């Protein structure tokens, strides 16, 4: 999966509550995908917009990071 495919999935499935590499402060209850240098970072935030302890995973491969990001986002949206 690449970024365009991930965005299409998000739109098609009407997924909400995410930050996909946006330069802004975290918001409450969202799944975050950030690129830092050559690494992809995926984590979740809580009701106070703080990073959830032990939720961060680091990937060297964009596809793996996007798969994890979409999986978490789908799970998060099922809980809403």
Task: Label each PLM-derived region with a short phrase.
Residues 60-73:
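A short, charged, amphipathic alpha-helix used as a generic interaction element across diverse proteins
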Residues 1-25:
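Negatively charged, low-complexity tracts enriched in Asp/Glu with abundant Ser/Thr
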Residues 75-80:
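Intrinsically disordered, low-complexity charged/polar segments
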């Amino acid at each position: 999966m690449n970024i365009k495919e991930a965005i299409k999935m998000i739109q098609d499935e009407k997924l909400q509550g995410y930050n996909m590499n946006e330069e802004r402060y975290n918001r409450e209850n969202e799944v975050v995908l950030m690129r830092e240098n050559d690494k992809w970072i995926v984590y979740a935030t809580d009701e106070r917009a703080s990073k959830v302890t032990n939720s961060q995973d680091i990937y060297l491969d964009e596809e793996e990071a996007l798969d994890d990001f979409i999986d978490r986002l789908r799970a998060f949206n099922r809980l809403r």
